From Swiss-Prot:
This is Hematopoietic progenitor cell antigen CD34. Residues 35-287 are extracellular. The chain crosses the membrane at residues 288-308. GO terms for biological process: cell-cell adhesion; endothelial cell proliferation; extracellular exosome assembly; glomerular endothelium development; glomerular filtration; hematopoietic stem cell proliferation; leukocyte migration; mesangial cell-matrix adhesion. It comes from Mus musculus. It is a single-pass type I membrane protein.
Amino acid sequence: MQVHRDTRAGLLLPWRWVALCLMSLLHLNNLTSATTETSTQGISPSVPTNESVEENITSSIPGSTSHYLIYQDSSKTTPAISETMVNFTVTSGIPSGSGTPHTFSQPQTSPTGILPTTSDSISTSEMTWKSSLPSINVSDYSPNNSSFEMTSPTEPYAYTSSSAPSAIKGEIKCSGIREVRLAQGICLELSEASSCEEFKKEKGEDLIQILCEKEEAEADAGASVCSLLLAQSEVRPECLLMVLANSTELPSKLQLMEKHQSDLRKLGIQSFNKQDIGSHQSYSRKTLIALVTSGVLLAILGTTGYFLMNRRSWSPTGERLGEDPYYTENGGGQGYSSGPGASPETQGKANVTRGAQENGTGQATSRNGHSARQHVVADTEL
């Protein structure tokens, strides 16, 4: 009986060892530890199987342990997908205060792809894979709390080139032709009529680059910024008058324009010459009528005054100045005349009377200072 028990115990001992080994192998299959490694793998088409595989990847970091679990179902068919490398920066929270980051790479799938799956009991479905950001920084790691900071791998930068020529700074001002106080300017003959504002908007910058070449050198020495004054002609719409602040600059400006004549033609300026600003000012019809009317009135007033000054003046009573009232009373200024049949004596008496009147008295000489009217004695008998 004792022999039978020993024999049975001897048979059961190997089975116990076998069961212990199987349990150890099963435990080893479930837990696999690995250090930080960099791998690049490609997922190739797999053959459907009836088992599901669980991969447990453990990264060993001093002071902390992270587990990355990836579940795969072997019954699903996945096509080949290329993978990209993603850098993980992990800073362990070791109490010693060392902040040395640990960097490792984890393969991730490329941008979003749709994978069909097949199964006996599950209908066809779609699985979406999303790629993570190119760079992930993991900081402030602790066993109980972990925070993730996501940053962009590239930063914008500015590129400047010092070899490019700097543009000439200047300005163009538009003014009315009547507001210009200078006498002369340069007429820019345009190929087609255009206002000053339109020309400034379309071709102003190019004109500054051409005409402000000399002024730019002076500006570097401390002078003011180049400024051009343009005025629209009222007589010729296709003419833009360029007015300069100093009339002595006209010859030098004309020489500069002749030097860049080909460039000016590209801007639509056919020709240019020096002209008087007053000739481009138009006068309205009302102004012309007012001037003519004023001239006619002045002529009429002048003629009337001339005739009034040459006319002989008369007294208020209507008598001529210089006539003797007594002479008018006694004879009315009429002389004595004798008829054809008058006698010589009568003519002599008339002459005596006329002589007395011409003396201014018209009276005969009186005695004792008294004047008496002369009595005429008739020669004929009554």
